[in-house]
Regions:
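Active-site Tyr-X1-5-Lys
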Residues: 1, 21-31
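Flexible, glycine-rich beta-alpha linker
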Residues: 1-20, 44
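C-terminal substrate-binding subdomain of Rossmann-fold SDR/epimerase-dehydratase oxidoreductases
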Residues: 28-158
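A general structural signal for well-ordered alpha-helical packing
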Residues: 19, 23, 54-57
Length: 158
């Protein structure tokens, strides 16, 4: 599995995936605010929406194929592009402040040739649509927390 994200996942506390962390930061930011990004933001990743992961896993379970396959998106983006996508979904202009922090590998992507060939599976949701669904869910969670008096502090960097 390659960088699975979406609603119902961890979205605060330091254990969240980059899409949820960025959506949270953008949600708390005012228009034209700045959020912190580790490194130069040019490190690349691919992110797969949870519904697509479930469909691929279901196909794998229902098949007679035995062997490892990659389940992920082949849509490679930089962390800077991920921030820009979340800002676009939110209708905000967000600036990025690049700071020192762990970067991980410079780039990572999924090769889906085998699962495409053996199971006929391919992802279809764009990153922007997945970010839209995740951002909207996080906004609802923030609103719910505010109503219950449990405001999550917008801390941390990505």
């Amino acid at each position: 599995y390659h960088n699975i994200f979406g609603p119902e996942g961890t979205w605060f506390g330091g254990r969240e995936k980059a899409p949820a962390a960025i959506c949270r930061k953008v949600a708390y930011a005012e228009d034209t605010d700045t959020i912190e990004v580790w490194g130069d933001g040019k490190q690349t990743r691919s992110f797969l929406f949870i519904d697509e992961c479930i469909e691929a896993t279901r196909r794998m379970m229902d098949s007679d194929f035995i062997g490892p396959v990659n389940i992920g998106s082949e849509e490679m983006v930089t962390i800077n592009q991920l921030v820009d996508t979340a800002a676009k979904v939110a209708g905000k202009k967000i600036d990025k402040k690049h700071i020192d922090g762990p970067l991980g590998v410079r780039g990572r992507n999924s090769n889906n040739d085998l699962i495409r060939k053996e199971l006929g599976w391919d992802y279809s949701m764009t990153l922007e649509e997945g970010i839209r669904r995740t951002y909207n869910w996080i906004m609802r969670e923030i609103a719910k927390d505010v109503m219950e008096g449990e405001v999550v502090e917008p801390v941390g960097t990505i």
